[in-house]
């Protein structure tokens, strides 16, 4: 569970006190992407629900705080999404498992919370977990229960089952009396959480639970023959030094020969596995691709898969606590991820809501076998409205051209850029890999003249570019003549407002540019820019809060600030409508 706890006041009349505290605190410490932790306090009531930066087609409740996506699954004709939710305010606290259902992953109906503190084994909290479909099409939820108050927060692993299996909405859930399934971890009771979807192999059900010891990230493996009595394996399935607490682990098979997803219990020759962990100390995630030894219950990353902080990420931006599930209807694996706010806590209280789930993504193994690729689920295309098509638009150095005819504040933009030569690619310094993203994108940003790039999109831009969020590429050549593509999403000019967290996000990616083309798709939605770049291999999500580039005053441009001319071969853009139902 992505735990972000903050100030607690009992009524709206305390807002003035909170404002004073926030002013002092933010001026001393600044604002960060995950918000600060105040262990002595629990919740704040929302003052109002403000809409100016509210998303139009991303998943979010009508009001209040959300964080981790939990237990996604498909059951009796409906997709289910549970999520960590504060029903009493727009900051972390009072967490329950909220529950929504959908026929298409786009339109959502909110139901009553499915799981909330009510038993001794979860009386202090119901934190993140997963769903598993047992034989006979019977769903079960595994989740972390908190059995002691702050500061200990001792954690156990529980399960819940539907009260009525014939109800496709699964409105009511029961917590059997034989909980907890797994008791408090004696070595680190406050860092033992977020059970995975279980898989069946060798006569046993198996699941992972995230943990840490002496700053070593750990994924413990548990086995059960009946899903009721669980025993820990003598050794973790995998560990890694200097990575800290592993939150929200995810472990699943991928096919080396097909884009189709696989059920978690699917095993076979050639099948690889993905282990993803969310790093509590950095608020980023990384994943490895490797081999699962089913007999010894070991996972070994491939030698081409970096294991640790420098590992591959699903998303190099504002993306955390992700969870995948197998969709048996369309035979695909779908990825959910949470994007926190990048404004201040006082902003969240004033607007009355915080947090979104990013657009669900289909995810599969690249043919190289070295990384995953992702794409928005096809259902999102049903929201497309008015459209514009740009063809063969040349961009010389310093040129930006507006993309008109769509609502730029709420759009889907899919572009292919090309260039005639790679000769102007600048030399790549290997040390850049280790630099902070802000430093890389500052020194090689959208306004800094280069050779091959920077070029890309200026999203959520004001007419005269006082505000804009650039998403762009810059191409380098390493000593071995291999190309390195830098992709950035840079929020530092996204808003004239002060007191915001305006990070630069970046990712370097190896991509085949033999055809001298590179792709970029951005889903733009008022305060979020989700970008899929470099042939679906590099993804960056940003939260931004423009003051001028809002509603009909938002603009979209293509640009080039490199000496090598760029051509927009194809650009297809659509205004995006809102779903007919959103919680």
UniProtKB/Swiss-Prot annotation:
Its main location: secreted. InterPro entries: ConA-like_dom_sf, Fructan_Metab_Enzymes, Glyco_hydro_32, Glyco_hydro_32_AS, Glyco_hydro_32_C, Glyco_hydro_32_N, Glyco_hydro_beta-prop_sf. Its EC number is 3.2.1.26. It is an enzyme of class 3 (hydrolase). Glycans are attached at residues 164, 280, 303, 340, 561. One of its GO terms (biological process) is carbohydrate metabolic process. GO terms for molecular function: beta-fructofuranosidase activity. GO terms for cellular component: extracellular region. SMART domains: Glyco_32. It comes from the Eukaryota. Keywords: Cell wall, Glycoprotein, Glycosidase, Hydrolase, Secreted, Signal, Zymogen. It catalyses: Hydrolysis of terminal non-reducing beta-D-fructofuranoside residues in beta-D-fructofuranosides. Belongs to the glycosyl hydrolase 32 family. May play an important role in phloem unloading and in stress response. This is Beta-fructofuranosidase, insoluble isoenzyme 3. It comes from Daucus carota. The lineage of its organism: Eukaryota, Viridiplantae, Streptophyta, Embryophyta, Tracheophyta.
């Amino acid at each position: 569970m992505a735990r972000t706890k903050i100030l607690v006041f009992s009524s709206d009349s305390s807002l003035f006190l909170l404002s004073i505290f926030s002013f002092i605190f933010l001026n001393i410490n600044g604002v960060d992407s995950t918000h600060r932790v105040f262990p002595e306090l629990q919740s704040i009531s929302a003052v109002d629900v403000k809409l100016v930066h509210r998303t139009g087609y991303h998943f979010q409740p009508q009001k209040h705080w959300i964080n981790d996506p939990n237990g996604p699954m498909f059951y009796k004709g409906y997709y289910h999404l549970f999520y960590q939710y504060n029903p009493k305010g727009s900051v972390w606290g009072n967490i329950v498992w909220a529950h929504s259902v959908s026929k298409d992953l786009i339109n959502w109906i909110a139901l009553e919370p499915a799981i909330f503190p009510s038993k001794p084994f979860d009386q202090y909290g119901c934190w993140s977990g997963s769903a598993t479909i047992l034989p006979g099409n019977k769903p079960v939820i595994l989740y972390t229960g908190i059995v002691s108050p702050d500061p200990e927060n001792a954690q156990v692993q529980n399960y819940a089952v539907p009260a009525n299996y014939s109800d496709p909405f699964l409105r009511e859930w029961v917590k059997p009396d034989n909980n907890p399934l797994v008791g408090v971890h004696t070595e680190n009771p406050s860092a033992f959480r977020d059970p995975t979807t279980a898989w069946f192999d060798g006569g046993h059900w198996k699941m992972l639970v995230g943990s840490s010891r002496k700053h070593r990230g750990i994924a413990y493996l548990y086995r059960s023959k009946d899903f009721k009595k669980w025993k820990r394996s003598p050794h973790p399935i995998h560990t890694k030094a200097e990575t800290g607490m592993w939150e929200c682990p995810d472990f699943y098979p991928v096919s080396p020969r097909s884009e189709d997803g696989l059920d978690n219990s699917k095993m076979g020759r050639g099948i690889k596995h993905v282990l993803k962990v969310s790093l509590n100390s950095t608020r980023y995630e990384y994943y490895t691709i490797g081999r699962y030894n089913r007999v010894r219950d070991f996972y070994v990353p491939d030698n081409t898969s970096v294991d640790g902080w420098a590992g591959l990420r699903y998303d190099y931006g504002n993306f955390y606590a992700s969870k995948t599930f197998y969709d048996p209807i369309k035979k695909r694996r779908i990825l959910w991820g949470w994007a926190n706010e990048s404004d201040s806590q006082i902003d969240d209280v004033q607007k009355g809501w915080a947090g979104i789930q990013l657009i669900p993504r289909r995810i599969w193994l690249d043919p190289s076998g070295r990384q995953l690729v992702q794409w928005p689920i096809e259902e999102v295309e049903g929201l497309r409205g008015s459209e514009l098509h740009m063809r063969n638009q040349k961009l010389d150095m310093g040129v930006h051209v507006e993309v008109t005819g769509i609502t730029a504040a709420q759009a889907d933009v899919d572009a292919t850029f090309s260039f005639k030569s790679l000769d102007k690619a600048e030399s790549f310094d290997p040390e850049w890999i280790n630099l902070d993203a802000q430093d890389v994108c500052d020194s090689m940003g959208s306004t800094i003249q280069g050779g091959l790039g920077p070029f890309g999109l200026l999203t959520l831009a004001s007419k005269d570019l006082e505000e804009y969020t650039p998403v762009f590429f810059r191409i380098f050549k390493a000593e071995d003549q291999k190309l390195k593509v830098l992709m950035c999403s840079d929020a530092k000019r996204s808003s004239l407002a002060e007191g915001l967290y305006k990070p630069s996000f970046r990712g370097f990616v190896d991509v085949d540019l033999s055809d001298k083309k590179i792709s970029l798709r951005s889903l733009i939605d008022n305060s979020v820019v989700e970008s899929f770049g470099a042939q679906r291999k590099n993804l960056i999500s940003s939260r931004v809060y423009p003051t001028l580039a809002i509603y009909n005053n938002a603009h979209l441009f293509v640009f080039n600030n490199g000496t090598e001319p760029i051509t927009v071969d194809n650009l297809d853009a659509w205004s995006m409508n809102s779903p007919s139902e959103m919680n």
